[in-house]
Amino acid sequence: MALRDLSSSLSSSSSPELHVLAVDDSFVDRKVIERLLKISACKVTTVESGTRALQYLGLDGDNGSSGLKDLKVNLIVTDYSMPGLTGYELLKKIKESSALREIPVVIMSSENIQPRIEQCMIEGAEEFLLKPVKLADVKRLKELIMRGGEAEEGKTKKLSPKRILQNDIDSSPSSSSTSSSSSSHDVSSLDDDTPSSKRIKLESRG
């Protein structure tokens, strides 16, 4: 329902601009995802922690959800590993909120750990992106949301990003690998056309 309803609301809006809340404790990674989203014509708000994200969304216990209608956040992209409130914990809190649970949440991580990926998907994540996030990833996410979850590349069956990624996971051998931290900061490779979900499968086979 979330992606389809979001697509309808954006299509009916006079200014169908996607507003993305990006959460990452790394300043460099925040700038990278902000740049990619802006290149893709998205409005971006960045915060440096899960706690700040909750405050912005009105889930910190002080503001309630009174400001949600003014925020109009269409997508939340968060790092998995952060001090304090992790991306996984942030995901759970968002999905437990009746006011926010329909907002798609995408998890990012430099670690390709299948149990972690599966755990996030079970809790309601729309997709799990392997860092460094590429422009192709952002464009694909935006396209999926604007189409209401319809898969790209001539697919006739509508699938959510969650299911698309799960297909990639199911077809790859079980493994755990870690990308170097420096790779997530490689700005020169932002235009790589290989989406993260495909890189997860390829690295699992490596």
Swiss-Prot record:
InterPro entries: ARR-like, CheY-like_superfamily, Sig_transdc_resp-reg_receiver. Keywords: Cytokinin signaling pathway, Nucleus, Phosphoprotein, Transcription, Transcription regulation, Two-component regulatory system. Coiled coil: none annotated. Belongs to the ARR family. Type-A subfamily. PROSITE patterns: RESPONSE_REGULATORY. The modification 4-aspartylphosphate is found at residue 79. Residues 151-206 are annotated as: Disordered. It is found in: Nucleus. Pfam families: Response_reg. GO terms for molecular function: phosphorelay response regulator activity. It comes from the Eukaryota. Functions as a response regulator involved in His-to-Asp phosphorelay signal transduction system. Phosphorylation of the Asp residue in the receiver domain activates the ability of the protein to promote the transcription of target genes. Type-A response regulators seem to act as negative regulators of the cytokinin signaling. Two-component system major event consists of a His-to-Asp phosphorelay between a sensor histidine kinase (HK) and a response regulator (RR). In plants, the His-to-Asp phosphorelay involves an additional intermediate named Histidine-containing phosphotransfer protein (HPt). This multistep phosphorelay consists of a His-Asp-His-Asp sequential transfer of a phosphate group between first a His and an Asp of the HK protein, followed by the transfer to a conserved His of the HPt protein and finally the transfer to an Asp in the receiver domain of the RR protein. Residues 19-146 form the Response regulatory domain. Its main location: nucleus. Residues 168-187 have a biased composition (Low complexity). GO terms for cellular component: cytoplasm; nucleus. Induction: By cytokinin (BA) in roots. GO terms for biological process: cytokinin-activated signaling pathway; regulation of DNA-templated transcription; response to cytokinin. This is Two-component response regulator ARR15.
